[in-house]
Swiss-Prot record:
It comes from Homo sapiens (Human). GO terms for molecular function: transcription coregulator activity. Component of the Mediator complex, which is composed of MED1, MED4, MED6, MED7, MED8, MED9, MED10, MED11, MED12, MED13, MED13L, MED14, MED15, MED16, MED17, MED18, MED19, MED20, MED21, MED22, MED23, MED24, MED25, MED26, MED27, MED29, MED30, MED31, CCNC, CDK8 and CDC2L6/CDK11. The MED12, MED13, CCNC and CDK8 subunits form a distinct module termed the CDK8 module. Mediator containing the CDK8 module is less active than Mediator lacking this module in supporting transcriptional activation. The gene is MED9. The keyword Heme does not apply. This is Mediator of RNA polymerase II transcription subunit 9.
Length: 146
């Protein structure tokens, strides 16, 4: 099979016309390379994933239902009486998370209102970043180098 692909590739090479070393008639010399322009700061749509600290990982475990569901499935496979304890723990975790969600800021807003608020905040960040860049470019102060 590999030889058939190689043979087909060789046939394709045989079909191509030979290239000439003469320059094309309408070509112009390339301009000298210039440094790339500095792009304006853009709001990031999705931040790059950061390595998690152990405290952050433990915090996320507090919000995860997966370990409890895993324990429930294991207990059901073994016909263990602990399944009721795990089910109660899962129910209490659901209640705890409902309370936590109800205290979050902006939860009373509709998704459209949340999107509008998000766009407004992103615009504010963009404007402030632009102002900060302008302020930095004024060179009013000499920054001491240490």
């Amino acid at each position: 099979m590999a030889s058939a692909g190689v043979a087909a590739g060789r046939q394709a090479e045989d079909v191509l016309p030979p290239t000439s070393d003469q320059p094309l008639p309408d070509t112009k010399p390339l301009p000298p390379p210039q440094p790339p322009p500095v792009p304006a700061p853009q709001p990031q749509q999705s931040p790059a994933p950061r390595p998690q600290s152990p405290a952050r990982a433990r915090e996320e475990e507090n919000y995860s239902f997966l370990p409890l569901v895993h324990n429930i499935i294991k207990c059901m496979d073994k016909d263990s009486p602990e399944v009721h304890q795990d089910l109660n723990a899962l129910k209490s975790k659901f209640q705890e998370m409902r309370k936590l969600i109800s205290t979050m800021p902006g939860i009373h807003l509709s998704p459209e209102q949340q999107q509008q608020q998000l766009q407004s905040l992103r615009e504010q960040v963009r404007t402030k970043n632009e102002l900060l860049q302008k302020y930095k470019s004024l060179c009013m102060f000499e920054i001491p180098k240490e």
